[in-house]
A protein has these predicted regions:
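N-terminal signal peptide c-region/cleavage motif recognized by signal peptidases
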Residues: 19-22
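Bacterial N-terminal signal peptides that target proteins for export
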Residues: 2-11
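N-terminal intrinsically disordered, low-complexity segments enriched in P/E/S/T
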Residues: 25-80, 84-169
Length: 169
């Protein structure tokens, strides 16, 4: 059955929807978005560092224009360098393990983020990444600028919906 909505009801519903999105965006900015845990031998400090999107946005941002296997055409991604985020931890990493919300895990050698401008993308085309668009955090390599990176090993490290970085000494 189709209901006719009055103009007033329609405006109320529209305002409610818009305010919900604003509230959701505010919550995402203030909730813990990334956990950096430190591992040394058999000792784990699971919650060494907890960062919000707002804190990640406060770091210097780098824009990368690149094509990916998961998007069409060249896209603009922006976020802090992975090495800058890891520098917030006191530990020097031999490698890290990136963990996605769904449990996907992949090791990333320190040579990657020390020698390549790998970012933790927070936006695509100036729009915040969402769960639907592989966010709120997506590891992005500069594939278009560095064709030698266009291989399976590097693509497998492009973790989307990143939730945790585990640092191993």
């Amino acid at each position: 059955m189709l209901y006719k909505l009055s103009k007033r009801t329609y405006l109320f519903l529209l305002l409610a929807l818009l305010s919900t999105n604003t509230i959701a965006a505010r919550v995402v900015n203030e909730e813990i978005a990334l956990i950096i845990s430190e591992h040394s031998g058999s000792v784990t400090n699971k919650h060494a560092l907890q960062l919000t999107i707002k804190q990640l946005q406060a770091l210097p941002q780098l824009e990368i224009k690149t094509q990916t296997r998961w998007t069409q055409g060249e896209k603009r991604f922006k976020g802090p360098l992975l090495r800058d985020v890891l520098a917030l931890s006191a530990k020097k990493a031999r490698y890290i393990t990136a963990v996605a919300i769904n449990g996907y895990r992949v090791d990333i050698p320190s040579q990657d983020y020390l020698n390549i401008d790998v970012i933790l993308a927070l936006t695509q085309a100036d729009k915040p990444l969402t769960l639907r668009t592989k966010g709120p955090i997506w590891i992005i390599y500069p594939w278009s600028a560095r064709p030698e990176l266009e291989q399976g090993a590097y693509y497998s490290r492009a973790v989307w919906q990143l939730s945790t970085l585990e640092i191993y000494e």
